[in-house]
Amino acid sequence: MHINNWPTHERPREKLLAHGAATLSDAELLAIFLGSGLRGHDAVQTARNLLHTHGPLRELLDRPPGDLMRLPGLGLARACKLTAALELSTRHLAAALQRGASIHDPISAGRYFAQRLRANPNEVFAVLFLDNRHRAISFEELFHGTINGAEVHPREVVRRALTLNAAAVIVGHNHPSGNREPSPADRMITQRLKNALDLIDVRLVDHFVIGDGAPVSFAEHGWL
C-alpha cells in the first residue's frame, strides 16, 4: 500500500508535524529523506530494508558517500544530500556553542556529544566546560583509548576546569561497540570525577554514553 493510502496519523510527515521529529522511528525519518521507495516498495519499507541490511542507523550514516551511493534506494544524489545533511547538523550544534548559547537542554547537549564522538573507532572521553551561566567555554577530547576503553584521570579534568575558570562541566564518551549501557567502570569514574570536581566547587551536570541510538544521560536516570 502506498503511503498516501495510509491513515493520516500513521504517515511519517504528518506524524513529524503533529508530534515532532523525535517521535519518529529511524525508518520513518529515513523514509522522509528518501521521499520515495524502490519499485514495488514504499519509502518506509525501503528505509526498513536499508537499516536491516546495512544498519543499524549509526553504521549506515557513518558510511562515506562513495559507499552510500551504491546502496539500493540511495544513489549519488541522495548519498550526497544525506552526507550534507549530517554535516549541517554537526555545524548547527557547533554554531550554537560558539555563539555562547546557554546549555540547559540535555537533548541538545547529548546530540552534540554524539555528533562529535560517535564516528570514532576507539573510545574517546570528552569534556564540555561551561561558565556560571552554562555557556560553552571549550569542548575538549581529553582522553583517547582503544576499542575497549579509555583511561580517565579526574585530576586532568580538574586542572583544565581551573585553567578555564569553569563553573560546570558535561562529560561524555563513546562505546565503539554501539552498546549504550554504562559499564560498572563508567559509573565508578563518574562518581570519582564528581567527587573531584565537588572539591573545587565545579558542578558535574551530566555524563553521556554514546552508542547506537539516543545518548544515555546519567542525569536523566538519576545516576549523578
UniProtKB/Swiss-Prot annotation:
Gene Ontology process terms (BP): proteolysis
Molecular functions per Gene Ontology: metal ion binding; metallopeptidase activity
Family affiliation: Belongs to the UPF0758 family.
Binding site for Zn(2+): 173, 175, 186
Domain MPN: from-to ranges: 102-224
InterPro entries: MPN, RadC_JAB, RuvA_2-like, UPF0758, UPF0758_CS, UPF0758_N
Motif (JAMM motif): 173-186
Protein's UniProt keywords contain Protease: yes
UniProt name for this protein: UPF0758 protein XF_0148
One Pfam entry name: UPF0758_N
Keywords per UniProt: Hydrolase, Metal-binding, Metalloprotease, Protease, Zinc
Source organism, top-level taxon: Bacteria
Gene3D superfamilies associated with the record: Cytidine Deaminase, domain 2 (3.40.140.10)
Keyword Flavoprotein: no
Species: Xylella fastidiosa (strain 9a5c)
